[in-house]
Every structure is written in C-alpha cells, then in structure tokens.
Amino acid sequence: MFKFITLFVFLLSTYVLADEKINGIYIGEIEDKYKNTYPVTTNLEITDAGVIKGQYEYKYGGKNWNGIFYDGKFSGKDLLIYWKEESRQGWLAINFDEKYASFSGTWGSTNNNGNWSGKK
C-alpha cells in the first residue's frame, strides 16, 4: 500500500510541476503554408484553476498582429490550444522538449497552415 501511495504522489507531483513549467514567454517563428517565416512571441500560462491560456504577437505585412489562446488541453508534453485574432481563429498543436524550454508544432484554421515554434 505504501508503494502505491508513493507512486501516486510522485506521478501527481510530476504532472503538476510539468504544467507549471510551460508558463512563460517563448520567442520563435510562425511558418505559413508558403514557407514564409515571421517572428512570433508566444506567452502561455496555466491559471490556479488549471485553465491554459495565453497571448501571441507577430508582424506580417507591416502590421503587428496579436491574438489570444484559450481552451488549452495538456497531455504529457503535448498541448492543443485554440487561437483567435480579429475575425480569424484556429488551433495550435505543439510538443514541448524535456525541460519545457522550447516547443514545435503546427497550426491552422481548418487545415494545417504551417509550423509554429518557440524557445524561452
């Protein structure tokens, strides 16, 4: 019984600590479906209530664009989160490295529109 409780506490603490490790600002690139890249700042956070949200900002066509992340679902080192800016919205699916210091993944609105990366 003691081994079971110890294992449960270890797994629970690992899950909670992993969640907290994604909090922060990541500097990276967005790549569109034409392989053009744009610098992006991605800010992710998990609230005390366990809600995963954030903001992002990038420059395209001489204009600064920004949006929000909402309704994130975290599983292991994978995060699926939704984004919205002005009249557009879509999804971002990323995978974190072992230390949660960087990520890479894909994004889109209906289909895969390109890649998205970031590093603390």
PLM-predicted stretches and their roles:
Residues 1-8:
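Sec-dependent signal peptide recognition
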Residues 7, 17-18:
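Intrinsically disordered and other compositionally biased segments
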